[in-house]
Amino acid sequence: MLQPKRTKFRKVQKGRNTGLAHRGSTVSFGSIAIKATERGRMTARQIEAARRTISRRIKRGGKIFIRVFPDKPITEKPLEVRMGNGKGNVEYWVCEIKPGKILYEIEGVNDELATQAFKLAAAKLPFKTTIVTRTVM
């Protein structure tokens, strides 16, 4: 599972996920990519599940580039614990996703196979996505 090796602070405030993705919004490494069209959170488990789905579909051909990393800790309090008494323990890690963010890229595979792999991976994600190709300028 993906998570940072070390962080400056153990717990972070909730914050708000607003705006559009400007960084990480273009296809940079591969030839075809999957892009988020809605905002949301992607847990480390979801990143890994989608990665496994893509790699199983494209088998040994091609290379997968993961463009997201879960760097935000999410805390939860145990069941049946009264309110107050501080913030809960870190339970899992998420990546805040804004519309327009590239999630995965594939290179070295024909576009039809990559599209099939991305459609299977999109079913594992908690927001709507679209498939985009690299534009050569």
From Swiss-Prot:
- Single Gene Ontology BP annotation: translation
UniProt keyword annotation of Transport present: no
* GO CC annotation terms, alphabetical: cytosolic large ribosomal subunit
**Keywords linked to the UniProt accession:** Ribonucleoprotein, Ribosomal protein, RNA-binding, rRNA-binding, tRNA-binding
Keyword rRNA-binding on entry: yes
Q: Name one GO molecular function term.
A: rRNA binding
Q: Which domain of life is it from?
A: Bacteria
What InterPro entries has UniProt attached to this entry? Ribosomal_uL16, Ribosomal_uL16_bact-type, Ribosomal_uL16_CS, Ribosomal_uL16_dom, Ribosomal_uL16_sf
Question: What Pfam families does UniProt report for this protein, alphabetically?
Answer: Ribosomal_L16
**Which NCBIfam families does this chain map to?**
rplP_bact (TIGR01164)
Q: Which family does it belong to?
A: Belongs to the universal ribosomal protein uL16 family.
Function, as annotated, reads:
Binds 23S rRNA and is also seen to make contacts with the A and possibly P site tRNAs.
Description of how the protein assembles with itself and partners:
Part of the 50S ribosomal subunit.
Q: What is this protein called?
A: Large ribosomal subunit protein uL16
The organism of origin for this protein: Acinetobacter baylyi (strain ATCC 33305 / BD413 / ADP1)
**Native organism taxonomy:** Bacteria, Pseudomonadati, Pseudomonadota, Gammaproteobacteria, Moraxellales
What is the gene name? rplP
